[in-house]
């Protein structure tokens, strides 16, 4: 139903029953008629439906919550006390790009995930400077299929970690686990086989939900897991094991590992941890900027931008004074 349709039904009932709303009774000791009860129920439905439509329009398609006091803010998990206990509070996701210790670009979003903030930040960088950065180094919160495809389409190198990067590179036991699908043997006919030499057959291919570039996953099922001596280590159910594989994403992860494990990648990672994280540390702890005081995403962007400008001016003056003293 839509509010207009329900309003038409209410109008038809008023004409059919010849209702006069001025004769309706309210309060204790008054008995409402059947017609009045039906009329009030329908009008309540119309009001609630209109309210829900308005809330959905405010929320938009890219988030599932908003604050009543600031419709642009989204509820996020935030560490608020010295014990690290997090609470669900309205907040914004502030993104900065740092180059040579200066804040080069600032962006504010109401997305809860950093993965959704990468592309807007890169577009904002290009809008400001006329080109995309060649080596955007980021932590594991930014490495996704969408962001990697965006980098390929715009000539950007992939230097963003993916969520399992640390486990892939630091945990040798996990990396060489023979029961992981990526470590299964491929025979001469191109068939994937598990450690028990059982073949995995292709079932179907499905689209990954919420992916704008049409990412697809292939599902394979083992031909027979009955009596397998590795069943306890290999699978968690009584059925034949199924695996999901995306060769394109797997190759992207391997490329990211090669980039970040190189000497150039190690230097970039070191600089990112010093400059980007250090900049946030200076803003929060040295400048005591821990809470946004304005409301509305446009006002918040202006506030954060002014803080970034102040940081850059302070950094420039300090460098200038150090160079003058050294000379």
Show the residue positions of the predicted features.
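Anion-binding and metal-coordination hotspots
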Residues: 1-327
């Amino acid at each position: 139903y839509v509010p207009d349709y329900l309003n038409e039904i209410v109008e038809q009932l008023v004409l059919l029953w010849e209702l006069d709303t001025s004769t309706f009774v309210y309060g204790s000791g008054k008995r409402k008629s059947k017609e009045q009860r039906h009329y009030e129920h329908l009008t309540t439905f119309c009001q609630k439906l209109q309210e829900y439509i308005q809330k959905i329009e405010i929320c938009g398609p890219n988030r599932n919550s908003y604050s009543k006091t600031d419709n642009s803010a989204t509820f996020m998990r935030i560490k608020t006390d010295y014990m690290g206990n997090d609470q669900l509070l309205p907040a914004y996701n502030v993104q900065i790009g740092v180059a040579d210790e200066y804040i080069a670009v600032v962006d504010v979003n109401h997305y809860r995930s950093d993965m959704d903030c990468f592309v807007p930040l890169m577009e904002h960088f290009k809008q400001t400077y006329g080109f995309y950065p060649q080596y955007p180094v980021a932590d594991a919160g930014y490495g996704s299929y969408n962001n990697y495809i965006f980098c390929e389409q715009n000539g950007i190198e992939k230097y963003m970690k993916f969520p399992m990067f640390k486990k892939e590179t630091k945990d040798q036991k996990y990396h060489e686990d023979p029961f992981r699908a990526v470590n299964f043997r491929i025979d001469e006919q191109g068939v994937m086989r598990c450690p028990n030499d059982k073949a995995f057959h292709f079932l179907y291919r499905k689209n990954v939900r919420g992916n704008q570039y049409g990412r697809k996953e292939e599902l394979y099922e083992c031909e027979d897991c009955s009596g397998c001596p590795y069943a306890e280590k290999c699978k968690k159910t009584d059925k034949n094991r199924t695996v999901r594989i995306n060769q394109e994403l797997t190759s992207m992860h391997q490329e990211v590992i090669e980039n970040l494990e190189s000497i150039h990648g190690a230097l970039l990672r070191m600089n990112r941890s010093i400059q980007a994280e250090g900049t946030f540390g200076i803003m929060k702890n040295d400048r005591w900027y821990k809470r946004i005081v304005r409301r509305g995403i446009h006002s918040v962007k202006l506030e954060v931008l002014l803080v970034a400008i102040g940081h850059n001016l302070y950094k420039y003056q300090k460098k200038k004074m150090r160079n003058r003293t050294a000379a």
